[in-house]
Amino acid sequence: MAEIKGLVDDHGIIYECNKILPEKYKIKLIEVLAELEDNECHKSHSFPKSQLHKVTGADKVYRADIDKISGWRLHVQYGEDKKLHLCEVLEPVEHDRGTKKKIMKQKKGKYL
């Protein structure tokens, strides 16, 4: 049985995704969340579905792609409790390089 890495959703990100994600991306969201929960992926630093990687210019914030082509993404952070905290879902228009820092500053209450 696989080891599970705890996911924390204090901000209702999964609920928000259910409301705003187009139907065709909801299954992909489940696959990404399952991959993020798989501790083996974290040990091997291999995330084939979500392409989890650090956000450039943001301290301790990581990005997981729900769908890379469409631009739907999740921002997550590793907490002091060694769990992965879901911070927010980014719509395709929100991940543009020029607006990334502005958006994160506006929503800083969602980040650890």
Where are the language model's segments positioned?
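Generic structural motif
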Residues: E3-D9, K49-L52, Y78
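Arg/Lys-rich, positively charged N-terminal/basic patches that mediate binding to nucleic acids
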Residues: M1-D38, L112
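A short, surface-exposed loop/turn module that caps and links secondary-structure elements
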Residues: D38-I66
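Residue-level detector of alpha-helical recognition elements and their boundaries
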Residues: K28-L29, S44, E91
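Enriched for short, Lys/Arg-rich terminal
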Residues: A2-I4, K19, D59-L112
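Preference for short coil/turn "hinge" residues that link or interrupt alpha-helices
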Residues: I14, H45-P48, Q77
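General structural signal for secondary-structure boundaries
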Residues: D9-H11, E40-C41, E91-G98
